[in-house]
Amino acid sequence: MASESDTEEFYDAPEDVHLGTGYPVGSPGKVGLLSFKEAENTANQAGNESPVQELRQDVSKKIIESIIEESQKVLQLEDDSLDSKGKGLSDEATAGPSVAGTEFSNIPGLLAIEHELQQDSEKAESQNVAEESELETQKCFPSDETCEKSEKTVDETDNLTEVSSGEQLDASGLEAETLNKEALEVKEGDVLDPASLDTLSTTDFAAVEEVAPAKPPRHLTPEPDIVASTKKPVPARPPPPTNFPPPRPPPPSRPAPPPRKKKSELEFEALKTPDLDVPKENITSDSLLTTNMASENTVRDSLPSLDLASATSGDKIVTAQENGKAPDVQTVAGEVMGPQRPRSNSGRELTDEEILASVMIKNLDTGEEIPLSLAEEKLPTGINPLTLHIMRRTKEYVSNDATQSDDEEKLQSQQTDTDGGRLKQKTTQLKKFLGKSVKRAKHLAEEYGERAINKVKSVRDEVFHTDQDDPSSSDDEGMPYTRPVKFKAAHGFKGPYDFDQIKVVQDLSGEHMGAVWTMKFSHCGRLLASAGQDNIVRIWALKNAFDYFNNMRMKYNTEGRVSPSPSQESLSSSKSDTDMGVCSGTDEDPDDKNAPFRQRPFCKYKGHTADLLDLSWSKNYFLLSSSMDKTVRLWHISRRECLCCFQHIDFVTAIAFHPRDDRYFLSGSLDGKLRLWNIPDKKVALWNEVDGQTKLITAANFCQNGKYAVIGTYDGRCIFYDTEHLKYHTQIHVRSTRGRNKVGRKITGIEPLPGENKILVTSNDSRIRLYDLRDLSLSMKYKGYVNSSSQIKASFSHDFTYLVSGSEDKYVYIWSTYHDLSKFTSVRRDRNDFWEGIKAHNAVVTSAIFAPNPSLMLSLDVQSEKLEGIDKYEDAEVLDSTSTGIVKTDNTEVLLSADFTGAIKVFINKRKTVS
C-alpha cells in the first residue's frame, strides 16, 4: 500500500533528476567531517551546551576509525543471516544521522542527542532544512567500499522489502533522492547508520541500545538537497513480510496538454470574413467527396452513382442514428409508438377538440388570443399544414399585413379586379356557386354546341370580370374548353413583355385530392413528380417517352417480382394502382394534340401517412420524397414498391440528392438537425445541428456543385456547411434593413445559380433575393408576389434567364434574372420590381416551375421527327444527354403551376423574336 511519501515521490521525480547531478563525490573523511559539523551547528542552535560538545569531539575520531574498520570486515561476512539483513535493510530505510564503529557504548548518547536535534529541527525547520538534507545525503557515501557493499546488499534483498528500489546507490540523483526520502521515515528513537547496519547481526542490536557516544560536530555544506529538506519525518512503516511482492513501478507521467492559442490569434480568426470561394485544393482527397470529382463531372462513367442493388440491400427502414450512435429509448419509443395523447387531471385522455381548445394563438397585430380550434377560420387562406404546425410550435399568428413593403416604394395593391372591395366581397359567394355551374356547362357543351359555349363564356366573364375584347382572355383554337390566361404586369413596366402570349396547353386537374405542395422535373425533363396533401407521389410522363419508361418498368417488374425482403409499407405500396399507366398512348384523347403529358399518371407511389413536403430526383431516376410523417422514402421509376425508408425525429421539410454523388442525400428537419445520409450503407454519414433560439430547418439544398450544403431556418438564416465534413462555414441573415421585415422571416426555398456562385433565396416576407457567394452580398431583390405563410419557392428557367414563383394571390409571377437595360432608362440594378403575372387558377398557386428541356414539349408532329428513336435507347444515360447542356429552342418556354385545390396547368410561351 503506497504511503504519502510514495505519492510525493512521483510528482517530485523530475526535480530530483535535475538536482542529483550536483552532489560532490569527495573522500570519506571529508564527507564525515562535514556531517559532524552540521550536527554540531544544529546542536548549538537547539541549546545543547559544552558537556555534549566535548563528548562529540572525543568520539569523532573513534567513529571515523570504526567506519574504516567496519568497511574492511564487511567483505568477510557470509550470507547466513538473510532475514536479519532484510530487517536491517528495512530499518536502514528509515534511519537518521550516521552512527558507525564498533564502540557501541557511545551509541545511546548519540541517540539522545539526535532525538533532541530532531525536536529542534521541527521547531526551527526554516533554519536548518538545508543542513539536515546535506547530512542525510552524505551519510549514504561514507566510503567507496561501504557503498559497494551497500549496493550489493540492496540487490540481494530487493524482493523482501518495499523500499529496496530506493536503496541502490547510484551516482545519478534519482536513486539518491529516493534513499533520502525513505531515510526520513524514522521510528522515534531508532537512529541507525545505513552503511554499517548491513554488517550487524541480531545480537548487535542489544549492544547498540546500551552505548550512547556523543555526536561529533557537523559542518555546513554549500550544496544542500532542497527537495529532501522539505520532507518532514513521519513514523516509519513496519517491515513487510518475507514473501511480500516487490513494489509496483510509479505510473507513467501524464502527457502535456496541447499548447493553447494566444488570445490575439483567436480574436484575429474571429474577425476574418468567411468567403465561400475556397480553392478546391483545400479539400482532402481521402474524405467523403474528392476534389477530382468536380473536374471529371463531364464524364458520367467516372462519377459514383447509386444503383438498384445497393439501394435495395440492407435494412428497409433506417433510423436517424448520428455517427453510429443509437437514439435514446425515449426517442425510439416516440418514433414507434408516436406521441402520447395528453391527459386530464383525472387521467382521462383528452379529445381532439379539447386539445385544440387548450392551445392559444395570439394575434401579434391586435393582441387578441384565440384557441386553436377557432383559429383555422381566421387564418389566411391557403395556409399549409406545415405552417400551421410551426405556428403551434412557436405560438405565433401569421398576419396578412406581414406582406407590407419595407422599402421606400409601397407594394402595389394586391387587388387584381377592377371593382372596389365592396363589390368583390359581395361576389365572393357568387363565384363559388357559379364555378360549379361553369364546370357542368363545359360537360354539356358538346351537346348544345356553340350556343352553350358562348353562354358559358358569358357567365365566366361576368364572374371573373374579364374583358371580352381583351386578346389575352380569349380561348385558344387548339385548346377547347380551357379557361384562358389573364396577363398583367407591374405598374411601371410598360413593355415589351415576354410572356403576354403564353397559352395553357394542358390541364392535369382531377388527380390530386387536395393541395399540391411540391413539383419536380427529372434531370432529363421527361418525368414530372408531384405530391401534396393526399400523401401520394404521382409520376407524370411525356407522351413520347412513355414507351421507354413502360418497357423499363416491365423489365424489372415481371409477374410477382418485387424487391427482396420488402417492408410492410412497401407491400402496400406495390399494390397501388401503378398499372393504370400501362395503357398505350392510343388511349389518350385525340383532340389533345398539344398536350405534352399523358392525361393519367405513369405511376403512383403510396406509403406516406401525412402530407408530402419535398421531392428530389437523381440522375438515374431515383426519387426521394419527404413527408410530415417524419420519414424520407426512396423510390425508383422501374419499381412499384418503396426501396428504403429513412426515419427522422420530426417533420422532414427539405431533401436534396448530392449533385455529383447520388449515393448521398441531404435532409433538413424541424428537429434542427441537418443530416447527410449514405444510401448504400443505410446510415447517417454526417450530421450537424443548428444553433440559436429557433432550431427549425425549413429549406435545404446544395450549392457550388455540391461543395457546400446550405439550409434555411424559420428565423431567416441561411447557414452554409462544407459538405466534406458538414462543418459550419458561414451564414447570411436574410432580412431587410428597416421596416416590418427587418426581423428575419421563414426561408421557404434555396436554389443555386450554376456558373455564377449565386443562390436564390425565397422567404415569407414576400421577397426573393439573389446573393453572391463570393462576398455574401445582395445582388438582386425581386418583389411583387405575395408569400406570407406558404411554402412557395422560386426557381430558374432552363437557361437561367427567368425565375418564376407561385403566389398567394392566385397568380404566377415571372421576373428576368437581370435587368434588360434596353427597356429601362433609370433603374436600380439591385432591385427588380418589373414582373409579369399570369392568372389561370382560382386558388393559391402553391408551386410553379419551368421545364428543364422545353424542346421535348413541342407539338407531337415536331417531336415525332426529333425523338422517333427514343425506344432504341438502352439505358437512362442516353435520355440524360440533353440535360447535360442548355438547349436553346427558338425562344420557347414551358411552364407548370399547381394550386391549393390540386389543379396542375401546363403553359407554353413563345417569345417574340426581335429583328
Curated annotation (Swiss-Prot):
GO terms for molecular function: molecular sequestering activity; small GTPase binding. Residues 114-139 form a coiled coil. Phosphorylated by ATK1; the phosphorylation stabilizes its interaction with RAB11A and RAB11B. Its main location: cytoplasm. Residues 235-258 have a biased composition (Pro residues). Residues 1-14, 469-478 have a biased composition (Acidic residues). The modification Phosphothreonine is found at T161, T221, T273, T351, T403. This is WD repeat-containing protein 44. A motif (FFAT-like motif) lies at residues 9-15. The modification Phosphotyrosine is found at Y11, Y481. Residues 146-155, 264-280 have a biased composition (Basic and acidic residues). Residues 1-24, 79-102, 117-174, 208-282, 399-425, 461-481, 559-593 are annotated as: Disordered. Signal peptide: none annotated. Downstream effector for Rab11 which regulates Rab11 intracellular membrane trafficking functions such as endocytic recycling, intracellular ciliogenesis and protein export. ATK1-mediated phosphorylation of WDR44 induces binding to Rab11 which activates endocytic recycling of transferrin receptor back to the plasma membrane. When bound to Rab11, prevents the formation of the ciliogenic Rab11-Rabin8/RAB3IP-RAB11FIP3 complex, therefore inhibiting preciliary trafficking and ciliogenesis. Keywords: Acetylation, Coiled coil, Cytoplasm, Endosome, Golgi apparatus, Membrane, Phosphoprotein, Repeat, WD repeat. Interacts with the GTP-bound form of RAB11 when membrane-associated. Interacts with GRAF1/ARHGAP26 or GRAF2/ARHGAP10; the interaction connects the endoplasmic reticulum (ER) with the endosomal tubule. Interacts (via FFAT-like motif) with VAPA (via MSP domain) or VAPB (via MSP domain); the interaction connects the ER with the endosomal tubule. Does not bind to other Rab and Rho small G proteins. It is found in: Cytoplasm, Cytosol; Cytoplasm, Perinuclear region; Endosome membrane; Golgi apparatus, trans-Golgi network. It comes from the Eukaryota. The modification Phosphoserine is found at residues 3, 27, 50, 66, 71, 81, 126, 264, 344, 346, 405, 472-474, 563, 567. Residues 336-349 are annotated as: Important for interaction with RAB11A. Transmembrane segments: none annotated. One of its GO terms (cellular component) is cytosol. WD repeats lie at residues 511-550, 607-645, 647-687, 692-731, 742-781, 786-825, 840-880, 882-915. GO terms for biological process: cytosolic ciliogenesis; negative regulation of cilium assembly; regulation of vesicle-mediated transport.
